[in-house]
């Protein structure tokens, strides 16, 4: 961690017109926190949640909208407790209106198909825990039961890892750990009453993380490759290891966020300890691949400084969020460095004009195989579209801000 401490100590400490709060100073009831500022910026850009992620009013059960609305809901819930005591119903209504539109009175989820066995479709279910707590609407609980039922039947690799999707047989992508495991853990903690079954689920969750770590780990870098094909049949994978070619920044960011979110949910014990160890190993390797000038991370994580590579906002926001939260949970060291990383995240990627926050340099999408035969080589990753305010960056930016504001 020494190298990144030096890097981040030299980073710019104020962010392009964004007024940063001072750690430990509680905002007044009328003072807007940065996390709220980001939420309001998005709500002003997109007055209805069906317009998030470029969907232009299309109703769709998708992880990107669900991810961002989960962050909105976290801002809403934290604002309601001390020291803020602020009930911002506009945020709640914005979130609830989308979920009420996409889930009918019986708990049927619009355009959801269990037979797709997509881990992406589990992710939007996380906000349902909060909505159910706040409203008591049975349809939210029914929808959660549907998603949990999918996980009970999710196809698995020979080692027991969840397939990423039905269309990607025997493949585990780092993305999928975030999509499924936090929901899996929270459902078990809340609703699985049988202690033996709950314990078995916790063990299964740990197994998912360990399996994908073991099979995507690159011994030369200490980083994790984007994905692994247990069958060794995909054109994009190494014929011996099954690994994809590169460590993609956001893929590792998903994995780190999944770790801290699940660690927070697990009771003390072997599984929590093992997941904490995985997180610590990652944060031992990450500083070596940070940009020396900013401390932020590249689109293709294992090729820092290579021609065409660029500092990428979504991955950097995910790493900063997971670092701050890991420190709060007592499983990562480096509070001062994590705080500096947050400042650098804002100074590198965030601008503000007229109270509207913009997050720049977000990779829109990246994957492997599929109908576009995505190869996962270096040129593929650096040539995917880059845009502002991608939900996969906005959500982690909000969570990083919330963690910083709790210091």
Residue ranges and their predicted role:
Residues 9-10, 27-66, 78-81, 85-92, ...:
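CBM-like carbohydrate-recognition segments
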Residues 174-175, 181-302, 309-320, 332-378:
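Extended ligand-binding clefts on enzyme/binding-domain cores
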């Amino acid at each position: 961690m020494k190298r990144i401490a030096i890097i981040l100590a030299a980073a710019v400490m104020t962010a392009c017109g964004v007024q940063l709060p001072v750690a430990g100073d509680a905002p007044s009831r009328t003072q807007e926190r940065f996390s709220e500022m980001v939420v309001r910026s998005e709500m002003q850009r997109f007055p209805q949640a069906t317009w998030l992620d470029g969907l232009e009013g299309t109703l769709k059960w998708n992880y990107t909208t669900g991810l961002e609305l989960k962050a909105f809901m976290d801002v809403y819930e934290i604002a309601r407790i001390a020291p803020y005591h602020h009930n911002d119903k506009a945020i709640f209504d914005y979130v609830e209106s989308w979920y009420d539109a996409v889930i009918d009175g019986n708990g049927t989820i619009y355009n959801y198909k269990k037979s797709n066995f997509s881990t992406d479709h589990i992710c939007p279910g996380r906000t349902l825990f909060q909505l159910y707590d706040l409203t008591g609407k049975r349809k939210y609980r029914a929808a959660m039961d549907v998603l949990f039922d999918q996980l009970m039947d999710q196809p698995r690799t020979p080692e027991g890892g969840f397939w990423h999707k039905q269309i990607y047989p025997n493949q585990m992508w780092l993305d999928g750990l975030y999509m499924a495991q936090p929901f899996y853990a929270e459902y078990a903690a809340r609703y699985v009453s049988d202690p033996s079954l709950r314990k078995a689920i916790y063990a299964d969750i740990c197994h998912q993380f360990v399996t994908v770590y073991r099979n995507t780990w690159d011994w030369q870098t200490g980083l994790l490759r984007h994905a692994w094909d247990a069958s060794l049949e995909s054109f994009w994978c190494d014929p011996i290891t099954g690994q994809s070619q590169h460590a993609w920044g956001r893929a590792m960011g998903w994995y780190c966020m999944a770790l801290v979110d699940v660690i927070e949910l697990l009771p003390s014990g072997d599984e929590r300890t093992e997941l904490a160890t995985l997180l610590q190993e990652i944060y031992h390797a990450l500083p070596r691949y940070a940009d020396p000038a900013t401390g932020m991370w590249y689109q293709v994580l294992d090729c820092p400084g290579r021609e065409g590579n660029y500092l990428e906002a979504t991955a950097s926001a995910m790493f900063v969020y997971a670092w701050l939260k890991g420190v709060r949970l007592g499983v990562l060291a480096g509070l001062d460095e994590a705080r500096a990383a947050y400042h650098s995240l804002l100074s590198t990627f965030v601008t503000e004009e007229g109270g509207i926050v913009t997050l720049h340099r977000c990779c829109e999408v990246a994957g492997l195989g599929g109908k576009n035969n995505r190869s996962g080589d270096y040129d593929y990753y650096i040539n995917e579209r880059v845009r502002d305010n991608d939900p996969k960056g906005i959500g982690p930016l909000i969570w990083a801000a919330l963690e910083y504001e709790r210091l």
